[in-house]
Curated annotation (Swiss-Prot):
One cellular component (GO) term of this entry: cytoplasm
SMART domains noted in UniProt: ZnF_C3H1 (SM00356)
Tissues with expression: Expressed in fast and slow myotomal muscle, heart, liver, skin, brain and testis.
UniProt xrefs under InterPro entries: Znf-CCCH_4, Znf-CCCH_Muscleblind-like, Znf_CCCH
GO molecular function annotations of the record: RNA binding; zinc ion binding
Compartment(s): Nucleus; Cytoplasm
Source organism (scientific name): Takifugu rubripes (Japanese pufferfish)
Coiled-coil ranges per UniProt: none
Protein name, entry field: Muscleblind-like protein 3
Pfam families named among the record's database cross-references: zf-CCCH, zf-CCCH_10, zf-CCCH_4
Amino acid sequence: MAVNMTMGRDTKWLTLEVCREFQRGTCSRSDAECKFAHPSRSCHVENGRVIACFDSLKGRCTRENCKYLHPPPHLKTQLEINGRNNLIQQKAAAAMLAQQMQFMLPGAQLQPITTFPMTHSLATSPSMAFSPYLNHMGPGMGLMPELLPSTPLLVPGSPTGLAAMSNGTSSPKHMRTDKLEVCREFQRGNCTRGESDCRYAHPLEAGMVDSSENSVIVCMDYIKGRCSRDKCKYFHPPAHLQARIKASQHQASQNTASAALSPPAGTMQLLPKRPVLEKSNGAVAGIFNPSMFHYQQALANMQLQQPAFIPTGEWCSGVVTLC
């Protein structure tokens, strides 16, 4: 079932902070070097922020005095990365909303949930082990966790994920953020873009290039502004590629942090059992379990439906003679 959604354009990913030194007229950096925006007089600045021109990112803005910012190459690269991340978030939100709409719209099909048999050792009597009136309910279902044996519970995950983990093939592959692909047109001498405009690396020395991957290793000291080597064997990227590397490192750190918080798929997570129903003052806590209540009520109804045994006979001097 498809859910149609009309989502307006979100301008948050197009918003840039304006350079305060530029507003005071004291910024010593140029537009292509400063990491903050240097808007023109025609741009609309609100609360120290300015919105970038979406048409300018596509290279199709024809307005003479555009009220939106036309960003330099290094800020344009940062905005393109923000736009891709924003699109991924919108698709994830749309998928989550479509999944939630299945529970509210009529005729929605619910996904089946795989369950496992409950504890059968609790059924000590044949009447509890089997009953034609309660044939769809396991004997251990509805009992409080505190009443079950004090053994840990195993929560099963995905069998495919467990098999993949056992084979050792589920380890994530970490992408390196200190490498840049070399421009093939630059290697042929046909690149029409400058070093500050091309999205690929333009190394000055051929010895920097890794021929197997056609990439160069970036000098991280140069990005941090502390490279003091005369002839550095690593690549010193321009400003727009530096912004791209910093954004990739930030995204990689976020992915690592989220992966560390979430358990791997398919693992058997051990859930500790709670102690017996005791409070700090020694009183027993009163707990109401709906499934247990319905189960006991069904047992009571099953007993009431059976015909009562009433002996029949004749009274003879206060003695009952059974027929």
